[in-house]
Structure formats: C-alpha cells, structure tokens
C-alpha cells in the first residue's frame, strides 16, 4: 500500500513523503491515527498544494512542544513504594503512573503512550525515562523509586555529588 504522510512518523518519514508500507501497518495504524492518507493521484496533487500549510502547522506544534520539553527535562518524579528486603518492588512503576505524575507536575496532559520505558521499573533506584511528545522531539525525566523519604534524600544527595565530581573533569579537559 502506498501512503502519503500528513504528519511526521518516527522511523518512517516527514510530511508529504510517499512511502510503500505493509497493508496492515497502513490500514491499522497510519490511516486510523490520521498520520497518512492513501496515495491516489488526487491525494498526491492535494498534498503538493497543502504541504507548505501542513509544515507550518507542524512547526507551530514543534515550538509548543519544545516549551513543554523545557519544563519536563528538569523534572524528578518520586515514587515511594513497598519493597522486599533486597529492594525489589511488589509490582512495578509503569508508564501510566509516570505520565500521570508528570502531567500533574507540568500542568499539561501527557499520555502514557508518550512515555518510553527501555526496561520495566521493578526495583528501587534512579532511572532515566524518555518522554516523546512529537516524532522528532524527545526529552528525559528522572524517576526515583525508593522505600522511604529518607532513602529519596540519600538518592538526591548521591546524585548531587556525582554531578559535582563530573563537572570539574569536564572543565579541565
């Protein structure tokens, strides 16, 4: 199936590009999500005319998301959970919980689909989690999972000492 992208799609392409994709990918994902339209002759002509307009709209969205990313990137999300003696959580911290807490912190609705977890969070510690609000823009937040408030303070002190020991090395190089 040939499609014309009307929004940028990560790992596929930019607005106005024509791509041949698997039928299922086009029918079940790209078309219903309004990321692409079928590449008919009429649609090709329409997209050529509307491409500039679509790119301008995308630039506006990018600038808004850049502002939101600036708010998000310095966030530290703290989760206090019950754990076993060896630090393993009874359950896990998932992308829905992270999205909910991040939405409250920045006063902007963030979907759990925008939270990219490399691995499941099943033990205490400090984790870097990717937040992707746009196909071309992403940022990271720090997620701290601990048993108690005192453990959180220990993690934060530890993180500050790591920063202070790495900064002078960067300056001297």
Curated annotation (Swiss-Prot):
One of its GO terms (biological process) is translation. Pfam families: Ribosomal_L9_C (PF03948), Ribosomal_L9_N (PF01281). PROSITE patterns: RIBOSOMAL_L9. GO terms for molecular function: rRNA binding; structural constituent of ribosome. GO terms for cellular component: ribonucleoprotein complex; ribosome. It comes from the Bacteria. Keywords: Ribonucleoprotein, Ribosomal protein, RNA-binding, rRNA-binding. Belongs to the bacterial ribosomal protein bL9 family. HAMAP family: Ribosomal_bL9. PANTHER family: 50S RIBOSOMAL PROTEIN L9. Binds to the 23S rRNA. This is Large ribosomal subunit protein bL9. It comes from Rickettsia bellii (strain RML369-C). The gene is rplI.
